[in-house]
């Protein structure tokens, strides 16, 4: 399990995802620096969760599970969440692709 960002929001997301899914692999990365937000903001995240809990579920079902797990944060602190929810049997150690830099938002 790895965590690429260690701010308080990232740590909370990691803790909640780990408790809910007991993942074989977990990455939580704050991508707010790619967006037009104040320095140090933790608003935009991507997560990669590899878990047996996702076996036999469609992508939309896996995403709903993650969104439900993080519902409080999505309603308050987190503005955007990119999800890679992968069944353990389908994971081959691949890393997430880099997200593109934000091209919109206030002041762009």
Swiss-Prot record:
One Pfam entry name? BolA
Q: Which InterPro entries match?
A: BolA, BolA-like_sf, BolA/IbaG_stress_morph_reg
Give the region (Disordered) as residue ranges.
89-108
Q: Which domain of life is it from?
A: Eukaryota
Which cellular component terms (GO) are annotated to the entry?
mitochondrion
Similarity comment: Belongs to the BolA/IbaG family.
Q: What is this protein called?
A: Putative bolA-like protein K11H12.1
